[in-house]
């Protein structure tokens, strides 16, 4: 039987189809890198100078043959390619393909394209983050029967603004009752250059509160509850608390067995966190748990689909720079996957 949970997932990633242009010849980049290394040696630059990043910054932002063939960072290297985005479900079945050409950007004037930095990884993250919501909006507009439920993406989408758009409001339209359509959960790893903070409690890198007397001791998640107002909250308790039976009443109650308790309560410390206050820290699920780890592994299905398109269906290595040809090949690859 088909796994309904995986079928309800929405996974996004981007890549590019390398075009047959001079700039993609390895000799082109190697010549520039060699010149920059010689320049750095002559100017006595220290070890912090990176000739590869300098080469990326000094190379043109698009191919001389066609301005639509952009300099991109894909599959661990920078090249000149047509960029596209692909959405699959957790089964790896393609749901939507966005070809990021002039027509796409004319349809989405809200996307602001800025000049590149000297970091290819940073450029890719910034560009992918700006393309995510418009691509998903196109998906759900084209397929109104699809419901956003669980989103999986990489750390490029780790920003407070994107969590708010993904998990609240009517980002993807409204249903028949006028209720806003948005995802219930988002599995996005944190970019640890920007850690988590909580004004009320001390939390670890996964957003789990920890003991005030022992930062290495995370509190134990005890599930979620919904208040009468409909607000969801997470409950955490001291991991050194055990349920014990009272011989006189026959009832069970909590007993804290900590030798250095952080609270005077015999039940031990309890913490309630309201995820709506910080969707980045609590995107409908908890990081650092077995459920998170097992679910996020499924994200690689979109990468396998991209590799299938490029390797099995022959998108990689196409000796053409014609946009319409490569766009058609990309769509035909998606259709072929659905047929086979």
Give residue spans per PLM region.
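Long, low-complexity, polar/charged, intrinsically disordered or flexibly structured peripheral segments
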Residues: 65, 234-288
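Short amphipathic alpha-helical "interface-anchor" segments enriched in bulky aromatics
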Residues: 200-238, 242, 275-321
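Active-site/pore-lining binding-face segments in mid-to-C-terminal subdomains
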Residues: 155-237
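Catalytic-loop motifs flanking and including active-site residues across diverse enzymes
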Residues: 128-131, 301, 305, 327, ...
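Polybasic low-complexity intrinsically disordered regions
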Residues: 1-150, 155-168, 172
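Short glycine/serine- and small hydrophobic-enriched flexible loop segments
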Residues: 337-340
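Membrane-interface transmembrane-helix boundary segments in multi-pass integral membrane proteins
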Residues: 320-334
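Extended accessory and catalytic-adjacent subdomains in large enzymes
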Residues: 192, 316, 333-335
């Amino acid at each position: 039987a088909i796994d309904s949970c995986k079928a309800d997932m929405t996974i996004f990633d981007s890549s590019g189809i390398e075009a047959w242009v001079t700039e993609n010849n390895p000799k082109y980049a190697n010549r520039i890198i060699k010149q920059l290394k010689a320049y750095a040696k002559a100017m006595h630059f220290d070890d912090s100078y990176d000739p590869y990043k300098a080469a990326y910054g000094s190379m043109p932002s698009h191919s001389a043959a066609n301005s639509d063939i952009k300099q991109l960072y894909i599959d661990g290297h920078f090249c000149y390619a047509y960029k596209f985005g692909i959405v699959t479900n957790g089964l790896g079945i393609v749901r939507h393909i966005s070809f990021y050409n002039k027509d796409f950007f004319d349809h989405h004037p809200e996307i602001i394209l800025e000049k590149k930095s000297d970091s290819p990884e940073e450029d890719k993250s910034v560009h992918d983050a700006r393309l995510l919501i418009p691509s998903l909006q196109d998906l759900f507009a084209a397929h109104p029967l699809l419901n956003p439920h669980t989103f999986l993406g990489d750390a490029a989408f780790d920003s407070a603004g994107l969590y708010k758009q993904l998990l609240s409001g009517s980002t993807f339209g409204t249903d028949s009752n006028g209720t806003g359509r948005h995802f219930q959960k988002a599995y996005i790893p944190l970019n640890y250059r920007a850690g988590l903070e909580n004004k009320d409690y001390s939390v670890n890198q996964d957003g789990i509160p920890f003991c005030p007397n022992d930062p290495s001791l995370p509190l134990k998640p005890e599930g979620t509850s919904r208040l009468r107002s409909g607000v969801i909250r997470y409950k955490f308790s001291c991991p050194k608390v055990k349920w014990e039976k009272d011989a006189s009443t026959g009832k069970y109650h909590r007993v804290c067995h900590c030798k250095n308790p952080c609270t005077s309560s015999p039940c031990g410390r309890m913490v309630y966190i309201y995820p709506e206050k910080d969707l980045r820290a609590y995107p409908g699920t908890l990081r650092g748990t077995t459920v998170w780890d097992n679910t996020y592994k499924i994200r690689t299905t979109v990468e396998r689909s991209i590799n299938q398109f490029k390797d099995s269906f022959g998108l990689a290595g196409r000796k053409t720079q014609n946009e319409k040809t490569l766009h058609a090949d990309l769509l035909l690859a998606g259709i072929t996957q659905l047929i086979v």
